[in-house]
UniProtKB/Swiss-Prot annotation:
EC number(s) on file: 2.7.8.26
Enzyme class label: transferase
UniProt GO BP: cobalamin biosynthetic process
UniProt protein name: Adenosylcobinamide-GDP ribazoletransferase
Listed GO MF terms: adenosylcobinamide-GDP ribazoletransferase activity; cobalamin 5'-phosphate synthase activity
InterPro entries associated with the record: CobS (IPR003805)
Name of the gene this protein is made from: cobS
Co-factor requirement: Mg(2+)
Catalytic activity of the protein: alpha-ribazole + adenosylcob(III)inamide-GDP = adenosylcob(III)alamin + GMP + H(+); alpha-ribazole 5'-phosphate + adenosylcob(III)inamide-GDP = adenosylcob(III)alamin 5'-phosphate + GMP + H(+)
Highest classification ranks of the organism: Bacteria, Bacillati, Bacillota, Bacilli, Bacillales
Transmembrane segments: 37-57, 58-78, 112-132, 139-159, 183-203, 205-225, 237-257
């Protein structure tokens, strides 16, 4: 139990700005539980966003326009901008139309290109639109937990089973300690957490099923694509999957509500 707890704290230290004032040893069991806890780290970010949304709704504070923008940036800030940076690096690399080796070098470059800026603006514009429309429809706060939970589940799976692009970097430093079994653990924990949201959070069964299927299809499709385009998985690729996954899932929520109302 202590090792599980340490892995969870390590996931929060690595993937969020939540202050964890504790030094945790980087070893095999802690890293395995870090990967297994990735969905729960997403759920922690989502819980803070859900609490903010619930309080604002309870006290009628802010318009849907304001809440959509505020909650959009709150999620990015709570993740430390780490995944947004990955999205930008992957965009720059992909739109260079170079070979996989050169794309890896571009992702390692700290400079920001035009395609990085344009793609991030496109990503966040659509996410803001989906948030705005769904907040107007008075969605349950638990959806703010479910979506980052599922996006990190896909990333944990890809990190555990995907081919590595290189032998250095964040993904490689984690991968040496883990296997496909850790992806199974992460998915089981995500399923249990999602089940709790179904029972206690008011998330409809069909909505949960649609979100889970959409994220599974995205992750399954991402694996061969990133191996072809970038030579494999990197930390930036995982960040891009998380950010792209969240926008996709909010789009699914928007489509479901639009269909129900239309």
């Amino acid at each position: 139990m202590r090792q599980m707890w340490n892995g969870w704290l390590l996931a929060l230290q690595l993937f969020t700005v939540i202050p964890i004032r504790r030094s945790i040893e980087w070893n095999d069991i802690h890293v395995r539980w870090l990967v297994r806890s990735m969905p729960l780290a997403g759920a922690a970010i989502g819980a803070l966003a859900a609490g903010t949304y619930a309080l604002c709704s309870m006290f009628s504070f802010g318009t849907p326009l304001f809440l959509a923008l505020f909650l959009l940036w709150l999620g990015i800030w709570l993740a430390g901008g780490l995944h947004a940076d990955g999205w930008m690096d992957v965009s720059d690399a992909f739109f260079s139309y170079r070979d996989a080796k050169r794309r890896q070098q571009i992702m390692s470059d700290s400079r920001v290109g035009a395609f990085a800026v344009l793609s991030l603006a496109c990503l966040l514009s659509f996410r803001w639109l989906f948030l705005y429309e769904t907040i107007k429809a008075e969605i349950p706060p638990a959806l703010f937990v479910a979506i980052p939970l599922l996006s990190r589940s896909g990333a944990a799976w890809l990190l555990s089973v995907g081919k590595l692009a290189k032998s250095t970097g964040m993904a490689a430093s984690v991968r040496e300690y883990i296997s496909w079994r850790d992806a199974v653990w992460a998915l089981v924990l995500a399923f249990l957490a999602l089940s709790l949201l179904l029972v206690f959070g008011g998330v409809p069964v069909w909505t949960s099923a649609a979100l889970a299927v959409a994220m599974a299809l995205l992750a399954l499709g991402a694996k061969p694509w990133v191996e072809k385009q970038f030579g494999g998985v990197t930390g930036d690729v995982l960040g891009a999957l998380i950010e792209g996954g969240e926008t996709l899932l909010w789009g699914v929520v928007w489509l479901l509500h639009s269909s129900a109302m239309g």
